[in-house]
């Protein structure tokens, strides 16, 4: 009995560490992408290349669980929405202030409530209405510009972060709708989606040229790809063993890591409006956790 309880506590402790590790990595992942872009590899191409590394490794790791997998419209929709989310997350971080982009991305619970109502026919509860109100108020506080007279994002990176959060919510709702897929298959769909969409964007919107990056940058591309696969597995492990309410609180530590990293590595700081708006958006995420629980 004692041994079973001990193993249970140990397993939960490992799961908590796994989620903290995931939040830490996602709070720092923008920095190597900025280094890669500074070396001459665009954000879109860097995303496609790093996710291609994750995809190749994933096909090796998951090969036994992917045999006989069936692909349908739901899986394609998950792949495309996840691709837009992940690509937008990286591009937003590259072209905007880290914390403003990340907080706009964290409006995802707002979109989740609305999309779940539209796609899954879930009722809008009082908690859901509170989430919508907190999210919108936080965004209004953070984005309000007296000189413009409107609470709109003012930089391309902010618009991209907002769109990435919407696509993240859409992907989550689609995954809940198509719950018959395995975690491994959904992970591979995400990786394939980012590679295809990223390369498509590069082909259509960027000049065709071979990047003249050094060996150290190409090694960094490979390392980031390995980390992307590893963190996907680590976070999935934690989410399967920790209640949703506690998991979201742990994952919100990404904001703390990102704020410290942006200040230390990029010299970016937040003003009073950003702190107040961010607090409301975080509160909305905590309400979202209560709804999920």
Describe the predicted segments one by one.
Residues 62-64, 108-130, 256-275:
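C-terminal transmembrane-helix exit sites in multi-pass transporters
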Residues 28, 65-100, 105, 141, ...:
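Specific transmembrane alpha-helical segments of multi-pass solute transporters/efflux pumps
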Residues 14-22, 65-88, 132, 155-164, ...:
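Loop-to-transmembrane-helix transition segments
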Residues 144-145, 248, 252-293:
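C-terminal-most transmembrane helix of multi-pass membrane proteins
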Residues 1-21, 113-166, 279-293:
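Juxtamembrane helix-loop boundary signature in multi-pass membrane transporters
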Residues 19, 23, 27-35, 58, ...:
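Transmembrane alpha-helical segments that form core, pore/gating elements
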Residues 102-107, 175-193, 229-264:
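Helix-helix packing/entry segments at the starts of transmembrane helices
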Residues 2-6, 54-71, 137-152, 194-217, ...:
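Membrane-interface helix-cap regions at the ends of transmembrane helices
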């Amino acid at each position: 009995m004692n041994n079973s309880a001990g193993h249970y506590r140990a397993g939960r402790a490992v799961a908590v560490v796994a989620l903290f590790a995931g939040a830490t990595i996602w709070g720092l992942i923008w920095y190597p992408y900025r280094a890669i872009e500074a070396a001459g590899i665009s954000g879109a191409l860097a995303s496609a290349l790093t996710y291609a590394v994750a995809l190749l490794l994933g096909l090796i790791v998951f090969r036994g669980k992917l045999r006989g997998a069936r692909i349908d419209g739901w899986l394609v929709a998950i792949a495309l929405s996840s691709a837009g989310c992940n690509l937008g997350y990286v591009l937003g971080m590259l072209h905007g202030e880290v914390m403003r982009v990340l907080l706009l991305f964290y409006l995802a619970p707002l979109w989740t409530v609305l999309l779940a109502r539209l796609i899954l026919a879930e009722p809008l509860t009082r908690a859901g209405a509170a989430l919508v109100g907190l999210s919108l108020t936080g965004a209004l506080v953070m984005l309000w510009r007296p000189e413009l007279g409107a609470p709109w994002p003012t930089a391309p990176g902010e618009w991209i972060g907002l769109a990435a959060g919407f696509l993240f919510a859409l992907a989550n709702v689609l995954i809940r709708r198509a719950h018959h897929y395995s975690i491994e298959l959904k992970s591979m769909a995400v990786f394939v989606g980012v590679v295809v969409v990223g390369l498509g964007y590069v082909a259509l919107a960027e000049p065709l040229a071979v990047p003249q990056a050094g060996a150290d940058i190409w090694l960094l591309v490979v390392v980031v790809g390995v980390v992307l696969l590893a963190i996907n597995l680590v976070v999935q492990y934690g989410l399967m063993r920790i209640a949703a309410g506690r998991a979201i609180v742990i994952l919100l530590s990404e904001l703390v890591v990102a704020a410290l990293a942006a200040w230390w590595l990029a010299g970016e700081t937040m003003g009073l409006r950003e702190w107040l708006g961010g607090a409301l958006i975080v509160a909305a995420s905590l309400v979202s956790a209560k709804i999920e629980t």
